[in-house]
Amino acid sequence: MLEAARWAPSHGQTEPWRFAVFTGESRAQLGASFAEAYRQFTPPAGFQALNSEAQRDKVWKAPVWISLGVLPTPKPTVSELEEIVAVACAAQNMMLMASSLGLACKWSSGLVNTHPSVARAISRKQPLTLLGFLYLGWPKSSWPSGKRAALETKVSWFE
């Protein structure tokens, strides 16, 4: 999967993706960083210990978690948006590869999974922007069928 990610397109071949893979007991550290992020962005009046515990414990739902980090290039000709899009392409490549291998894979973002404190916890050397995490494992049941709006509602044709 990581090899598939490596071949995603990036403007100027900047390859801005940075991944951290969490398996086994290392997920406990990741869960602690999720709980800390929840504590940091939740006002004291709204803080709920049960939600904090849920953030900490969610890492045990899947055996593998992969962070989706963006390390933008200093090149002035490449925008930060292009770097984010490149990492999104890398994530899509990983998700397609996971599916081809029969693995269940979910991209989880949100305030906790993209919080700067989580980024600092997993990448002390380089300041990253997190787009979230892929978590994956073997599906417990048959894969649900997807639903999408009709293509005609999403495409305009010009001649």
Can you name each region flagged by the protein language model?
Residues 24-26, 71-73, 138-141:
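Short loop segments at secondary-structure junctions
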